[in-house]
């Protein structure tokens, strides 16, 4: 599978749940499946990074269930998803095409990751709204979205092993 397809998919995950994408990427980097050493994104592989992103992802999963949580489409939420999708996409594509020296591969991965985040944000909101209408409440739809995001991120990370 192309690194750009993986970058797009991790961007979609960021659109669904902003912190799951960098958590997955940081675990891949920490496990040595994503060679980011010596690149500007090497921090993804630092010892504490996967734990920090995982804690943030769990907090996001919990707070998403709260009724006072703002829409993912408000500028701050939307912007964060785009930035995290871009960073995650750059890490995936750049690790396999060389990020050192500002490689175009990492830049293209960032763009593709950002596009994926927009797709995931808008598409995820639409699907969740439809599911919530079908179930008559939001909680089951949110849980389905959580599972889809986690499983997709895990599949993306596993597909990078031995890439």
Predicted segment positions?
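C-terminal ends of transmembrane helices
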Residues: 58-74, 122-134
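Juxtamembrane boundary at the C-terminal end of a transmembrane helix
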Residues: 154-163
């Amino acid at each position: 599978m192309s690194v750009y397809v993986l970058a797009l998919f991790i961007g979609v995950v960021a659109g669904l749940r902003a912190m799951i994408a960098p958590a997955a990427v940081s675990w891949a980097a920490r496990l040595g499946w994503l060679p980011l050493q010596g690149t500007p994104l090497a921090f993804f592989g630092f010892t504490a990074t996967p734990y920090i992103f995982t804690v943030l992802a769990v907090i996001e999963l919990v707070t998403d269930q709260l009724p006072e949580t703002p829409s993912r489409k408000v500028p701050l939420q939307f912007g964060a998803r785009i930035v995290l999708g871009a960073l995650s996409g750059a890490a995936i594509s750049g690790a396999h095409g060389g990020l050192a020296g500002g490689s175009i591969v990492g830049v293209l991965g960032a763009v593709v990751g950002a596009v994926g985040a927009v797709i995931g944000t808008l598409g995820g909101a639409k699907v969740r709204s439809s599911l919530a209408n079908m179930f008559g409440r939001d909680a089951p739809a949110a849980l389905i979205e959580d599972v889809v995001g986690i499983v997709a991120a895990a599949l993306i990370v596993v597909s990078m092993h031995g890439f």
